[in-house]
Amino acid sequence: IVFRAAQERSDIEIVAINDLLDADYMAYMLKYDSTHGRFNGTVEVKDGHLIVNGKKIRVTAERDPANLKWDEVGVDVVAEATGLFLTDETARKHITAGAKKVVLTGPSKDNTPMFVKGANFDKYEGQDIVSNASCTTNCLAPLAKVINDNFGIIEGLMTTVHATTATQKTVDGPSHKDWRGGRGASQNIIPSSTGAAKAVGKVLPELNGKLTGMAFRVPTPNVSVVDLTVRLEKAASYEEIKKAIKAASEGPMKGVLGYTEDDVVSTDFNGEVCTSVFDAKAGIALNDNFVKLV
Protein backbone atom coordinates (compact mmCIF):
# COMPACT_ATOMS: atom_id res chain seq x y z
CA ILE A 1 0.00 0.00 0.00
CA VAL A 2 2.88 2.38 0.77
CA PHE A 3 4.39 1.57 -2.62
CA ARG A 4 1.12 2.11 -4.49
CA ALA A 5 0.46 5.41 -2.72
CA ALA A 6 4.00 6.64 -3.42
CA GLN A 7 3.65 5.78 -7.11
CA GLU A 8 0.79 8.27 -7.33
CA ARG A 9 3.08 11.14 -6.31
CA SER A 10 5.63 12.94 -8.46
CA ASP A 11 7.68 14.08 -5.45
CA ILE A 12 8.50 10.57 -4.20
CA GLU A 13 10.84 8.10 -5.88
CA ILE A 14 11.13 4.57 -4.51
CA VAL A 15 14.70 3.37 -4.93
CA ALA A 16 14.93 0.26 -2.74
CA ILE A 17 12.87 -2.37 -0.93
CA ASN A 18 14.06 -4.73 1.78
CA ASP A 19 11.93 -7.82 2.39
CA LEU A 20 12.59 -11.47 3.08
CA LEU A 21 10.30 -12.37 0.15
CA ASP A 22 11.96 -13.05 -3.19
CA ALA A 23 11.59 -10.49 -5.97
CA ASP A 24 9.32 -12.64 -8.15
CA TYR A 25 6.77 -12.99 -5.36
CA MET A 26 7.04 -9.30 -4.50
CA ALA A 27 6.26 -8.48 -8.12
CA TYR A 28 3.24 -10.78 -8.01
CA MET A 29 1.90 -9.18 -4.82
CA LEU A 30 2.35 -5.71 -6.30
CA LYS A 31 0.60 -6.62 -9.55
CA TYR A 32 -2.44 -8.25 -7.99
CA ASP A 33 -4.40 -7.15 -4.93
CA SER A 34 -7.72 -8.70 -3.90
CA THR A 35 -8.87 -5.47 -2.28
CA HIS A 36 -7.35 -2.69 -4.37
CA GLY A 37 -7.24 -4.41 -7.74
CA ARG A 38 -4.46 -4.71 -10.30
CA PHE A 39 -1.49 -2.36 -10.23
CA ASN A 40 -1.77 0.49 -12.72
CA GLY A 41 1.61 0.12 -14.38
CA THR A 42 4.26 -2.36 -15.46
CA VAL A 43 6.05 -4.67 -13.04
CA GLU A 44 9.00 -6.88 -14.00
CA VAL A 45 11.91 -8.65 -12.34
CA LYS A 46 15.45 -8.44 -13.70
CA ASP A 47 18.60 -9.78 -12.03
CA GLY A 48 16.75 -10.11 -8.72
CA HIS A 49 15.50 -6.52 -8.69
CA LEU A 50 12.12 -4.95 -9.47
CA ILE A 51 11.56 -2.90 -12.60
CA VAL A 52 8.42 -0.80 -12.09
CA ASN A 53 7.26 1.46 -14.91
CA GLY A 54 10.73 1.11 -16.39
CA LYS A 55 12.61 2.18 -13.25
CA LYS A 56 14.90 -0.19 -11.34
CA ILE A 57 14.25 -0.69 -7.63
CA ARG A 58 16.96 -2.40 -5.63
CA VAL A 59 15.72 -5.48 -3.74
CA THR A 60 17.49 -6.85 -0.67
CA ALA A 61 16.63 -9.45 1.96
CA GLU A 62 18.56 -8.37 5.05
CA ARG A 63 17.30 -9.33 8.50
CA ASP A 64 19.41 -6.65 10.19
CA PRO A 65 18.61 -3.10 9.01
CA ALA A 66 22.15 -2.00 9.87
CA ASN A 67 23.40 -3.97 6.85
CA LEU A 68 21.14 -2.32 4.28
CA LYS A 69 23.60 0.24 2.84
CA TRP A 70 20.85 2.75 2.13
CA ASP A 71 23.46 5.38 1.28
CA GLU A 72 24.45 3.41 -1.84
CA VAL A 73 21.07 4.19 -3.42
CA GLY A 74 20.61 7.67 -1.94
CA VAL A 75 17.77 6.89 0.47
CA ASP A 76 16.35 9.94 2.24
CA VAL A 77 13.43 8.35 4.10
CA VAL A 78 12.78 4.73 5.10
CA ALA A 79 9.20 3.57 5.65
CA GLU A 80 9.69 0.98 8.39
CA ALA A 81 6.67 -1.25 7.75
CA THR A 82 7.78 -4.63 9.09
CA GLY A 83 6.30 -4.04 12.53
CA LEU A 84 9.52 -5.40 14.05
CA PHE A 85 11.60 -2.26 14.59
CA LEU A 86 9.29 0.06 16.50
CA THR A 87 11.73 1.61 18.96
CA ASP A 88 14.31 4.34 18.49
CA GLU A 89 17.12 1.88 19.19
CA THR A 90 16.07 -0.67 16.57
CA ALA A 91 14.85 1.81 13.95
CA ARG A 92 18.09 3.76 14.27
CA LYS A 93 19.84 0.90 12.48
CA HIS A 94 18.39 2.37 9.28
CA ILE A 95 20.22 5.62 10.07
CA THR A 96 23.40 3.63 10.68
CA ALA A 97 22.91 2.11 7.23
CA GLY A 98 22.84 5.55 5.61
CA ALA A 99 19.20 6.70 5.63
CA LYS A 100 18.46 10.25 6.77
CA LYS A 101 14.99 9.75 8.26
CA VAL A 102 12.80 6.83 9.37
CA VAL A 103 8.99 6.78 9.54
CA LEU A 104 7.43 3.95 11.54
CA THR A 105 4.13 2.86 9.98
CA GLY A 106 2.70 1.81 13.35
CA PRO A 107 2.65 3.11 16.92
CA SER A 108 6.08 3.19 18.54
CA LYS A 109 6.81 0.91 21.48
CA ASP A 110 8.88 3.51 23.31
CA ASN A 111 8.85 7.30 23.47
CA THR A 112 9.57 7.82 19.78
CA PRO A 113 7.40 10.84 18.90
CA MET A 114 4.16 10.24 16.98
CA PHE A 115 2.89 12.64 14.37
CA VAL A 116 -0.56 12.59 12.77
CA LYS A 117 -1.41 14.79 9.82
CA GLY A 118 -4.15 17.22 10.78
CA ALA A 119 -3.28 16.95 14.46
CA ASN A 120 0.31 17.84 15.30
CA PHE A 121 2.47 18.08 12.16
CA ASP A 122 3.21 21.66 13.21
CA LYS A 123 5.06 20.30 16.26
CA TYR A 124 7.62 18.41 14.16
CA GLU A 125 11.12 19.68 14.97
CA GLY A 126 13.26 17.69 12.56
CA GLN A 127 13.51 14.42 14.50
CA ASP A 128 15.11 11.71 12.38
CA ILE A 129 12.88 8.88 13.65
CA VAL A 130 9.12 9.34 14.01
CA SER A 131 5.96 7.24 14.16
CA ASN A 132 2.90 7.91 12.02
CA ALA A 133 0.75 6.14 14.67
CA SER A 134 -2.01 3.69 13.70
CA CYS A 135 -4.71 3.89 11.06
CA THR A 136 -7.35 4.32 13.79
CA THR A 137 -5.46 7.17 15.44
CA ASN A 138 -5.12 8.86 12.04
CA CYS A 139 -8.89 8.63 11.64
CA LEU A 140 -9.73 9.78 15.15
CA ALA A 141 -7.21 12.54 15.84
CA PRO A 142 -8.21 15.07 13.13
CA LEU A 143 -11.89 14.81 14.10
CA ALA A 144 -11.12 15.03 17.82
CA LYS A 145 -8.98 18.12 17.24
CA VAL A 146 -11.74 19.94 15.36
CA ILE A 147 -14.29 19.13 18.04
CA ASN A 148 -11.99 20.05 20.91
CA ASP A 149 -10.82 23.30 19.29
CA ASN A 150 -14.39 24.43 18.62
CA PHE A 151 -16.42 23.02 21.49
CA GLY A 152 -14.06 21.45 24.03
CA ILE A 153 -14.08 17.75 24.89
CA ILE A 154 -14.68 16.94 28.56
CA GLU A 155 -14.36 13.19 28.00
CA GLY A 156 -15.11 10.62 25.35
CA LEU A 157 -15.29 6.98 24.38
CA MET A 158 -14.33 5.58 20.99
CA THR A 159 -15.33 2.35 19.32
CA THR A 160 -13.70 1.33 16.07
CA VAL A 161 -15.48 -1.22 13.91
CA HIS A 162 -12.34 -2.56 12.31
CA ALA A 163 -11.86 -4.55 9.11
CA THR A 164 -10.09 -7.91 9.28
CA THR A 165 -6.30 -7.81 9.39
CA ALA A 166 -3.62 -10.29 8.35
CA THR A 167 -2.91 -11.28 11.96
CA GLN A 168 -6.36 -12.85 12.35
CA LYS A 169 -7.27 -16.50 11.74
CA THR A 170 -9.29 -17.69 8.75
CA VAL A 171 -10.78 -20.39 11.02
CA ASP A 172 -10.48 -20.97 14.77
CA GLY A 173 -6.84 -21.46 15.74
CA PRO A 174 -4.46 -21.17 18.69
CA SER A 175 -3.99 -17.68 20.10
CA HIS A 176 -2.65 -17.97 23.63
CA LYS A 177 -2.41 -14.25 24.40
CA ASP A 178 -5.75 -13.26 22.85
CA TRP A 179 -8.29 -16.08 23.00
CA ARG A 180 -11.02 -14.17 21.16
CA GLY A 181 -8.52 -13.09 18.53
CA GLY A 182 -7.96 -16.73 17.65
CA ARG A 183 -11.53 -17.21 16.47
CA GLY A 184 -12.40 -17.35 12.77
CA ALA A 185 -12.27 -13.86 11.26
CA SER A 186 -14.95 -14.48 8.63
CA GLN A 187 -17.39 -15.99 11.14
CA ASN A 188 -17.38 -13.54 14.02
CA ILE A 189 -17.62 -10.03 15.37
CA ILE A 190 -14.64 -10.05 17.73
CA PRO A 191 -14.26 -7.57 20.61
CA SER A 192 -10.67 -6.40 20.90
CA SER A 193 -8.49 -3.83 22.60
CA THR A 194 -6.97 -0.79 20.93
CA GLY A 195 -4.64 1.91 22.15
CA ALA A 196 -5.70 4.30 19.39
CA ALA A 197 -7.82 6.60 21.55
CA LYS A 198 -5.18 6.90 24.26
CA ALA A 199 -2.59 7.55 21.55
CA VAL A 200 -4.54 10.65 20.58
CA GLY A 201 -3.38 12.05 23.91
CA LYS A 202 0.20 11.75 22.70
CA VAL A 203 -0.38 13.75 19.52
CA LEU A 204 -2.89 16.11 21.15
CA PRO A 205 -1.69 16.58 24.76
CA GLU A 206 -4.76 18.66 25.59
CA LEU A 207 -6.81 15.44 25.25
CA ASN A 208 -4.48 13.25 27.30
CA GLY A 209 -6.54 11.17 29.74
CA LYS A 210 -9.84 12.29 28.21
CA LEU A 211 -10.31 9.53 25.62
CA THR A 212 -10.21 5.75 25.64
CA GLY A 213 -11.75 3.09 23.45
CA MET A 214 -12.15 -0.44 22.18
CA ALA A 215 -12.48 -2.25 18.87
CA PHE A 216 -14.71 -4.78 17.16
CA ARG A 217 -13.05 -6.81 14.41
CA VAL A 218 -15.63 -7.56 11.71
CA PRO A 219 -15.64 -9.79 8.60
CA THR A 220 -14.94 -7.11 5.98
CA PRO A 221 -11.70 -6.93 3.94
CA ASN A 222 -11.04 -3.19 4.14
CA VAL A 223 -12.19 0.17 5.56
CA SER A 224 -12.88 0.71 9.25
CA VAL A 225 -15.15 3.15 11.07
CA VAL A 226 -14.62 5.17 14.23
CA ASP A 227 -17.58 5.91 16.50
CA LEU A 228 -16.63 8.79 18.80
CA THR A 229 -19.00 9.65 21.65
CA VAL A 230 -18.08 12.80 23.56
CA ARG A 231 -19.33 15.15 26.24
CA LEU A 232 -18.82 18.77 25.22
CA GLU A 233 -17.83 21.79 27.32
CA LYS A 234 -19.60 24.24 25.02
CA ALA A 235 -23.17 23.39 24.09
CA ALA A 236 -23.72 22.98 20.35
CA SER A 237 -26.43 21.58 18.13
CA TYR A 238 -25.56 18.75 15.78
CA GLU A 239 -25.95 21.18 12.88
CA GLU A 240 -23.38 23.52 14.42
CA ILE A 241 -20.98 20.61 14.87
CA LYS A 242 -21.43 19.58 11.23
CA LYS A 243 -20.78 23.15 10.12
CA ALA A 244 -17.50 23.32 12.07
CA ILE A 245 -16.28 20.00 10.67
CA LYS A 246 -17.21 20.95 7.11
CA ALA A 247 -15.38 24.27 7.46
CA ALA A 248 -12.26 22.45 8.65
CA SER A 249 -12.50 19.94 5.80
CA GLU A 250 -12.59 22.77 3.26
CA GLY A 251 -9.95 24.85 5.05
CA PRO A 252 -6.98 23.91 7.23
CA MET A 253 -7.68 20.17 7.08
CA LYS A 254 -8.44 19.89 3.39
CA GLY A 255 -7.05 16.61 2.06
CA VAL A 256 -6.84 15.14 5.57
CA LEU A 257 -10.35 15.34 6.99
CA GLY A 258 -13.14 14.72 4.50
CA TYR A 259 -16.86 15.46 4.84
CA THR A 260 -19.83 13.73 3.27
CA GLU A 261 -23.60 13.91 3.51
CA ASP A 262 -24.12 11.06 1.04
CA ASP A 263 -25.68 7.72 2.03
CA VAL A 264 -22.35 5.94 1.99
CA VAL A 265 -21.21 2.50 3.19
CA SER A 266 -17.74 1.20 3.95
CA THR A 267 -16.73 0.04 0.46
CA ASP A 268 -17.32 3.56 -0.84
CA PHE A 269 -14.11 4.54 0.96
CA ASN A 270 -11.86 1.91 -0.59
CA GLY A 271 -8.79 3.83 -1.74
CA GLU A 272 -9.86 7.05 0.03
CA VAL A 273 -7.02 9.59 0.11
CA CYS A 274 -8.21 11.42 3.24
CA THR A 275 -7.14 9.77 6.48
CA SER A 276 -10.51 10.57 8.04
CA VAL A 277 -13.94 11.25 6.55
CA PHE A 278 -16.81 12.56 8.67
CA ASP A 279 -20.16 10.92 7.87
CA ALA A 280 -22.59 13.73 8.63
CA LYS A 281 -25.72 11.58 8.31
CA ALA A 282 -24.51 8.80 10.60
CA GLY A 283 -24.00 10.76 13.83
CA ILE A 284 -26.59 11.58 16.48
CA ALA A 285 -26.93 13.91 19.46
CA LEU A 286 -28.68 13.13 22.74
CA ASN A 287 -28.54 16.79 23.67
CA ASP A 288 -26.34 19.82 22.98
CA ASN A 289 -23.56 18.50 25.22
CA PHE A 290 -23.55 14.78 24.40
CA VAL A 291 -22.98 13.60 20.84
CA LYS A 292 -21.95 10.57 18.80
CA LEU A 293 -19.83 11.24 15.69
CA VAL A 294 -18.94 8.79 12.90
From Swiss-Prot:
Where D-glyceraldehyde 3-phosphate is bound, by residue? 134-136, 165, 194-195, 217
Enumerate the residues binding NAD(+).
Answer: 19, 63, 105
Q: By its UniProt entry, which InterPro entries does this protein fall under?
A: GlycerAld/Erythrose_P_DH (IPR020831), GlycerAld_3-P_DH_AS (IPR020830), GlycerAld_3-P_DH_cat (IPR020829), GlycerAld_3-P_DH_NAD(P)-bd (IPR020828), Glyceraldehyde-3-P_DH_1 (IPR006424), NAD(P)-bd_dom_sf (IPR036291)
| Primary location group | cytoplasm
Q: Where is the active site?
A: 135 (nucleophile)
What's the Enzyme Commission number for this chain? Answer: 1.2.1.12
Pfam families per record: Gp_dh_C (PF02800), Gp_dh_N (PF00044)
A molecular function annotated in GO for this UniProt entry is: NADP binding
The organism's superkingdom is given as Bacteria
Subcellular location, record wording: Cytoplasm
Q: Which GO terms describe its biological process?
A: glucose metabolic process; glycolytic process
Transmembrane annotation, as ranges: none
Q: What is the catalytic activity of this protein? A: D-glyceraldehyde 3-phosphate + phosphate + NAD(+) = (2R)-3-phospho-glyceroyl phosphate + NADH + H(+)
Keyword list, A-Z: Cytoplasm, Glycolysis, NAD, Nucleotide-binding, Oxidoreductase
Q: Where is this site: Activates thiol group during catalysis?
A: 162
Q: Give the residue ranges for region: Disordered.
A: 169-188
Q: In which pathway does it act?
A: Carbohydrate degradation; glycolysis; pyruvate from D-glyceraldehyde 3-phosphate: step 1/5
Q: Name one GO cellular component term.
A: cytoplasm
Spell out the family assignment given in the record's similarity comment.
Belongs to the glyceraldehyde-3-phosphate dehydrogenase family.
Q: What is this protein's function?
A: Catalyzes the oxidative phosphorylation of glyceraldehyde 3-phosphate (G3P) to 1,3-bisphosphoglycerate (BPG) using the cofactor NAD. The first reaction step involves the formation of a hemiacetal intermediate between G3P and a cysteine residue, and this hemiacetal intermediate is then oxidized to a thioester, with concomitant reduction of NAD to NADH. The reduced NADH is then exchanged with the second NAD, and the thioester is attacked by a nucleophilic inorganic phosphate to produce BPG.
The annotated subunit structure for this chain is:
Homotetramer.
PANTHER family per UniProt: GLYCERALDEHYDE 3-PHOSPHATE DEHYDROGENASE, GLYCERALDEHYDE-3-PHOSPHATE DEHYDROGENASE-RELATED
Question: How is this protein named in the record?
Answer: Glyceraldehyde-3-phosphate dehydrogenase
Organism annotation: Citrobacter freundii
